[in-house]
Amino acid sequence: MAIVWLSSFRLLDLKRSDYMAAERMNDSILTSVKKMLGLSEEYDAFDLDIITHINSVFTILTQIGVGPGNGFMIEDKTPVWTDFIQDSGIYQLVKSYMVLKVRLLFDPPMSSAVLECYKTQVNEYEWRLKTMAENQEVNNQNE
């Protein structure tokens, strides 16, 4: 009985985590990037700069095969992550890549060691995203 209950609990917990991931994917792209940069949603002095950098990163993501084939851009806080990507499996990686690239463009670290660490991480994320996009393309061709 306890095993069944534990099994059900894990299943319930899994469903809850899927629900929570879906909720996060419905967050505003601009707002979530700003939060991860340490800016409040209300503080809009740098919104134009951040939006410009976000759109640059969307161009890079499109070029490596992630997101809509015809590109994507934002103009305000209205677009949410699911407007760009529906695959919850790579959502966190896309979001991490976005934030790190925007941070490097908007507010690069003063320390050369930290800067190099960020660049290395960006390169790894980019490689992983490109590889995942290529694998998905191959899988779609085989279907």
PLM feature segments, named:
Residues 33-45, 62-69:
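Structural recognition of short helix-loop-helix hairpins that underlie histone-fold modules
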Residues 29, 49, 53, 93-94, ...:
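Residue-level detector of well-ordered alpha-helical segments, enriched
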